[in-house]
Amino acid sequence: MINDWIELAAADGQRFRAYRSLPPEEPLGSVIVIQEVFGVNRHIRWVAEQISAHGYAAYAPCVFDRVGGNVELDYDDAGIAVGRERVAMLGFDQALLDIAATAAVAEAHGPVGVIGFCWGGTLAWLCATRLGLPAVSYYGARTRPFLDEIPKAPLLMHFGLRDALIPQDFHDELKHKHPDLPVHFYPAGHGFNCNERADFHAESAALAWRRTFAFFRQHLAEAPRFALH
């Protein structure tokens, strides 16, 4: 496995870093890992390495580079405050420019998919609806304003039933507007996949990973080449 940092450029000329993890053998495809509000921190790099261990090239773009680089925050109140401030400064459209640029590079390894967590879970939704990339969204708490958008690519969603950030009426609206979308619920809180957070739930995380890799095995094999518009 090769783990390193690379520099990429978005369509508007913005340069940004990305953490890259490559498997020892020819990749099965590529997966873009989209951060939480805490930046491309140790956990997000670990996620990229887990994906690489399953045979995919993994790229984690540092989308916060647009609003001040080298952002790597802890899972505490101070980290949440700084992360939310960066999210407010950045918005979704600029982050999608960086993700699209990452996808254009990542497709050198084959079909491209996306996985995102929390804020990145909402970006994963937008990757499916706007970029046409197969996507896995973990507990995307900011997705509600975009529920009228129609996915252009396969989409899988994971939520914790004890997630205080995502109310039941969100789930009801999601089911009403997208009744055929595969959505899984777990007996866990927000951030249940992250073993550095208080809400980490090992059994739920393991089951979600199995479903996630089954999704990528199926849909990256079927995915068309990514076209950057």
Question: For each predicted feature, which ranges?
Answer:
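N-terminal cap/leader regions of alpha/beta-hydrolase-fold enzymes
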Residues: 1-229
